[in-house]
Amino acid sequence: MSLFKGSGVALITPFKDEESVDFETLGRLVDFHLEHKTDAIIVCGTTGEPSTMPDDEHLEVIRFVIDRVAGRKPVIAGVGSNHTKHAVYLSKKAQELGADGLLHVTPYYNKTTQKGLIEHFKEINDAVSIPIIVYNVPSRTGLNVLPETMKELAKLPNVKAIKEASGNITQVAEIAMLCPEIDIYSGNDDQIVPILSVGGIGVISVLANILPDETHDIVEYFLNGEIEKARELQLKLLPIIKALFIEVNPIPVKEAMNMMGFNVGKPRLPLTTMTEKNREILKKALVDYGISVKE
């Protein structure tokens, strides 16, 4: 059984001016997604900035979101690390907190080989009993999960899915061919329809932070056979998607949410606020779509 079909929001983490987590705003964001069409909540994925959180804060954010959701939608915890024992520790803690699944980015910086990648996930698999989503994002990690490697990972009983953000549709198709038992989620908002077309069942989305219903609708249209509607909506959203990645994620999406009145604060250093030029491009994309923004 799939963790979810449709749109899983890669939830941002709001911060106060002194950079502590703004749990009051975080609660409102969770409620926003519970009230809209978001199908799953991914907490402390890349967009949630876990790389600048100590473990106690990281786990407290996960706990807070799980408790706030209270079983109404699946909560998937981002607990990846380039240190296998650390990844195991975070995975066990997230499972204890009640996470429905785990999102694991591949090891980064030290990178490893494909063999090391398999051994890394074996250790994690053996430590937990909830579904694991492998997160392949070579642009950030310097490591690509090859289709043949994913075939080996699919033999692990808790590895159930892959978030594919390689940008390589041929590779995604090969994974779908070699691993029919594995659920595939697009990791790129501009490739939702292409990945659905080769067997994907959803997206783990930055866009869903600001347009949860539309992001869900792309997937629902496609899976219901309304391919043209899905295609049209994917293309209609493309200017906003491009603007959301005009600088490193999550800088633009946080700026967009602030423009929309969510008051989520700034990202933590080393991420900075947007340049004024790019901010105006983002603002125009939002306004052109019909989103009300603060001046």
Curated annotation (Swiss-Prot):
Domain of life, per lineage: Bacteria
Active-site residues (renumbered): Y135, K163
Residues passing through the membrane, by range: none
Keywords: Amino-acid biosynthesis, Cytoplasm, Diaminopimelate biosynthesis, Lyase, Lysine biosynthesis, Schiff base
Pathway: Amino-acid biosynthesis; L-lysine biosynthesis via DAP pathway; (S)-tetrahydrodipicolinate from L-aspartate: step 3/4
Single Gene Ontology BP annotation: diaminopimelate biosynthetic process
InterPro entries referenced in this protein's UniProt entry, alphabetically: Aldolase_TIM, DapA, DapA-like, Schiff_base-form_aldolases_AS
Main location: cytoplasm
Subcellular location as annotated: Cytoplasm
Site entry: Part of a proton relay during catalysis: T46, Y109
Example of a GO cellular component annotation carried by this entry: cytosol
CDD domains for the chain: DHDPS
Substrates-to-products reaction catalysed: L-aspartate 4-semialdehyde + pyruvate = (2S,4S)-4-hydroxy-2,3,4,5-tetrahydrodipicolinate + H2O + H(+)
GO molecular function: 4-hydroxy-tetrahydrodipicolinate synthase activity
Tagged with keyword Cytoplasm: yes
Role, per record: Catalyzes the condensation of (S)-aspartate-beta-semialdehyde [(S)-ASA] and pyruvate to 4-hydroxy-tetrahydrodipicolinate (HTPA).
Family named by the database record: Belongs to the DapA family.
Alphabetized NCBIfam families for the sequence: dapA (TIGR00674)
Official protein name in the record: 4-hydroxy-tetrahydrodipicolinate synthase
Organism annotation: Caldicellulosiruptor bescii (strain ATCC BAA-1888 / DSM 6725 / KCTC 15123 / Z-1320) (Anaerocellum thermophilum)
Gene behind this protein: dapA
